[in-house]
Amino acid sequence: TLTAGIAQDGRRLDYFLRTANVPGNLDNVALAGLYGHVAGNRGQVNLCQKNRAGREGFRFGLDVAWNDSLVRAGVTPPDPVFGYEPWTVNPGNYLVYRYGKSIDADLDMRHGDQRFAIRTVPGAGASDDIRLDIAGLNIGSALGLLPSAPPVDGVLGTDMTLGMTPDSLTLRGDLSIAELSYDKRRFGNVDFGLYYKQDQGHMADARLTLDGAEVLTVRGDYRAERESPLDLTATIPGFPLQQANVFLPD
């Protein structure tokens, strides 16, 4: 069942959208809703979800404000729920995007050893960078919110830094999944490293390791002014196909 509504109170516009499923149909998303309001140059959006047993899968919101030069958002409430688990979020958190291609942030969400943080950090040049720091994130719990989630599990960690100026973009860092498994069958410890830069052209350098052994490296450079714009090299030292079998049906 899908219900929706809009109501006006002076300059404020309230809205909601709710879906409810009958027993036996998507029981992990028995009830889901989106609601909030808009007033002038400010607004709020809230999302919630419960399973058939009444457990909250997620409950969080965003306070948003905007003007002719930027958009600012903050996560609410101070005790949001993600992946059926209670988290905490730092007071006064914010994400700001300036239309001149600039981002500022101070967001730190935690649950036990799990962390999701986005922060402004000093950059190599005149502009600041944005750092994404994820540690100990349980993939299985997060995917469990999806109606037809694949049976994937593991622990996600990320340390990525994004640098932006009006003329260039740089992305560098690492992503790891410890004890990645599919349908409770182990695949391995996966690590992915990336460096990417865009200015007058594009340059990328990536590597992939599995259980500490390098299985793929890619290096590329694209310059439109060259006779052969793309220079790309990929190396596969050796990929253990037996481990890849965990993703294939029996």
Show the residue positions of the predicted features.
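Interface amphipathic segments
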Residues: T1-T161, T165-D250
